[in-house]
């Protein structure tokens, strides 16, 4: 059998053929981005937590049945007074619960939910702080160098934990370490 080759003008068309011949046509599986890996592990942990409570996790883009919505929201995000609070330089106050399935997932992945809450809120609002204080973003980033270092360290830990969670058999990723 004869394989038609591209004309010399389209030599670029030979690169995929050459690559296929050299590698045996096996393509490496794409590596998901760190954000996607952490997001998938968070989802696996929160879904398992909800299921342990007898609740059906909502699917992305779908709302739970109205009768279950309050129960699922409370189980997922926590209830009662918020335990975590941070006032930003803009005056905006960010609050979160430490209880709930999301809090448990963050504790598992980041190792210190309170610290993660603080540094992630700060890092996610650096541009708003720069705008509010009329300072260059580089100056604001420099002022928060320690927070940025903590954020990177905790994200690295979360990626490692997320990989572990996703490589475990179903419903074991929620076990404490």
Question: Which positions does each model-derived feature cover?
Answer:
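Mitochondrial intermembrane space
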Residues: 2-11, 19-20, 25-177
């Amino acid at each position: 059998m004869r394989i038609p080759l591209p004309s010399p003008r389209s030599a670029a068309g030979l690169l995929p053929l050459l690559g296929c011949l050299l590698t045996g046509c096996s393509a490496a599986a794409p590596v998901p981005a760190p954000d996607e890996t952490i997001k998938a592990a968070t989802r696996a942990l929160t879904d398992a937590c909800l299921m342990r409570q007898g609740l059906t996790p909502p699917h992305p883009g779908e709302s739970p049945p109205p009768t279950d919505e309050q129960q699922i929201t409370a189980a997922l995000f926590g209830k009662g007074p918020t335990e975590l609070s941070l006032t930003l330089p803009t005056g905006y106050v960010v609050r979160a619960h430490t209880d709930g399935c999301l809090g448990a997932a963050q504790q598992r992945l980041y190792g210190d939910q309170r610290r993660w809450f603080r540094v992630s809120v700060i890092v996610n609002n650096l541009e708003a702080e720069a705008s509010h204080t009329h300072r260059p973003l580089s100056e604001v980033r420099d002022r928060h160098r320690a927070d940025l270092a903590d954020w990177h360290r905790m994200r690295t830990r979360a990626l490692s934990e997320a990989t572990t969670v996703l490589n475990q058999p179903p419903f074991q990723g929620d076990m404490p370490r």
